[in-house]
Amino acid sequence: VYHKNNRISTVVSATNKTLSFNKKWTVANGMVQLATAFPQAKIVWCNTHCQENLNLKSIEVLFHHNKMMLSYCPDDNSYLGSKIGYVEESPFIKVNKKVSYPTWQMSSAVGVIHAAVLLEIKDKIKTDCDFDYYLNSVAKIGMPLGLLCYSEPKLLTETTIEKSSKASVFDLFKFVKEHYRTRWLFLLLLNFVVYEFRFPVV
């Protein structure tokens, strides 16, 4: 699934056949629809900026288990940014981009997941949201349930730094509200006031 600006641009099968799709779909919705149509397939997503460097050959080796989710963000900063560290101090936050690294922080730049996983959680996550938000939600929900999520640099043959999508303050608070206990929402707000010297208007 090649995409740009939160919309699908092209869908290509493993046999290099171009597949039809609804241009009104968000990328997340399109992936769920593809998972429904091809429930045994590995679904790869790639931003058009990274298309020339997509390492499809590596996926067969790297993606050795159906309960895996691999992704890679060439940008130094993740979608949710460093401020997610206000509510979580786990090793999953500071990702080593040079090696395969366990983390729930996924990226719309490039990645792969099995259709069965998307079908399993399709009723738990809305698909009308930003694609990065959707991917991070999938991993955040999936990891405690046994989904193996990794940042994997080998998904790209060459790393080119592209500005990736970043969460707004509203999206950050929304993510914390959906995936953490309520007290962490108040802690995030407190940290914004104390360390950012501002009261976030969301």
Predicted regions and their residues:
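Mixed-charge (acidic/basic) macromolecular-recognition segments
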Residues: 123, 157-173
